[in-house]
């Protein structure tokens, strides 16, 4: 699932099928796809996510049926397929929150050594609860977006004052992102069983860290300017 646009179009929803994108707004106009409240003509999937898990599952089943070999809708669907080489991809969601979890044992130990010089140290609560912090939702961008080298305060261990400088230790981590597609009610916990039905999908993402800026800004409240 994604959002795409050709030069003459506004961004709207589509589904990648091999080397093509199925234009969902066009498929609706052709009469082969329902879901009038899904907002496929919009530049995000948020309207569709609000339909809930049952609609998500039904839509996926409908897609599989429509795209099966010798589908009766083949003649109507063919004009709705756009070559991937002809489109630009856009951020598929309006993201209000981005929580970054600290869930890899090896990564946690490596960062501990980087920041504190202690090899293999895990925080005492690490094995007992998911550790996370509010990251920068405003810095989420699609693949291929140019990344500027960050500027910030950097303090070397052997000097008293920080300097303003370009980052020299820009790090990135391949991560798995889970998209929460359902709203929660403040003050009401979500069970493990309920949580599974609230996940709309998964994405791969790169978490960028300006390590030399982060080591100075990290204490005592955690990363801020140094993360994207």
Give the residues covered by each predicted segment.
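General structural signal for secondary-structure boundaries
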Residues: 23, 40-55, 83, 182, ...
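Glycine-centered structural positions embedded in regular secondary structure
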Residues: 2, 12-15, 81, 201, ...
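Gly/serine-rich nucleotide phosphate-binding loop at the start of the catalytic core
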Residues: 2-72
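Glycine-enriched loop-and-adjacent helix/strand subsegments that border the catalytic/binding cleft
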Residues: 90-228
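Non-catalytic accessory segments adjacent to catalytic cores
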Residues: 53-99, 103
């Amino acid at each position: 699932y994604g959002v795409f646009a050709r030069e003459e179009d506004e961004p709207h929803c589509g589904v990648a099928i091999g080397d093509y994108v199925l234009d969902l707004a066009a498929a609706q106009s052709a009469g082969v796809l329902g879901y009038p409240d899904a907002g496929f003509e919009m530049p995000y999937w948020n309207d569709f996510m609000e339909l809930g898990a049952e609609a998500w599952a039904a839509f996926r089943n409908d897609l599989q049926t429509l795209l099966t070999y010798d589908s009766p809708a083949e003649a109507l669907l063919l004009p709705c397929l756009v070559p991937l080489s002809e489109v630009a991809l856009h951020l598929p969601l309006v993201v209000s929150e981005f929580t970054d979890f600290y869930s890899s044992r090896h990564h946690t130990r490596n960062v501990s050594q980087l920041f504190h010089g202690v090899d293999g140290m895990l925080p005492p609560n690490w094995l007992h609860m998911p550790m996370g912090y509010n990251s920068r939702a405003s810095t989420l961008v699609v693949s291929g977006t140019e990344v500027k080298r960050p500027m910030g305060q950097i303090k070397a261990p052997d000097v008293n004052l920080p300097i303003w400088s370009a980052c020299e230790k820009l790090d990135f981590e391949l991560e798995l992102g889970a998209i929460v597609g359902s709203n929660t009610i403040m003050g009401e916990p979500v069970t493990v069983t309920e949580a599974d039905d609230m996940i709309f999908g998964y994405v791969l993402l790169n978490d960028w860290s300006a390590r030399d800026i982060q080591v100075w800004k990290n204490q005592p409240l955690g990363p801020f300017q140094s993360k994207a």
